[in-house]
Amino acid sequence: MNIPFEMGYTFDETLREKPISLAEMKQGIAFLKEHLHEGSLYGKSCGLIGVYERIAGNLPESKYYLQAAIEYYTQTDNIKGIFINKLRLAHTYHWERKFPAANALFTELLQTLPDLPAYEDFFYQHYGKSKLDEGHFHTALSYFQKALQIRLQKGNEELIHSTKLCITYCMSHR
């Protein structure tokens, strides 16, 4: 579905996503909710709403929609959908500074990571950011370095740049 609003974001000085336009992102979230229907796109739409709600700072709504996506993908036995949305939920717990909940999800996801190697770099990037905010700089740096190795192989410059930002931030704050 094409969202007719600016849903882009940048990263702030603490490596958190920040909407290019908060007002437009909120309009985009409302648009997604208006078009949310049970069906083949339900899980994907709930996941997107959960991500955008987190970026917009509405963490309770983020958790609600990510949990709805996880439930949907669990019912349809979609392992990839479950993994992606549990990773997103861990990210929301991280933003809430609920590190035990975030770490429990990261630990669970680590067990299924061998089945979903395409998401390994995203896993290590998000886990690294959580560990960084938790004050575990050495662990965070090792996760960012793992993410960077994978991303260099993939060759996606935007992802490589975001991981290098994380490494630079980590090195300057330890």
Name each model-derived stretch.
Residues M1-R174:
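Intrinsically disordered, low-complexity regions
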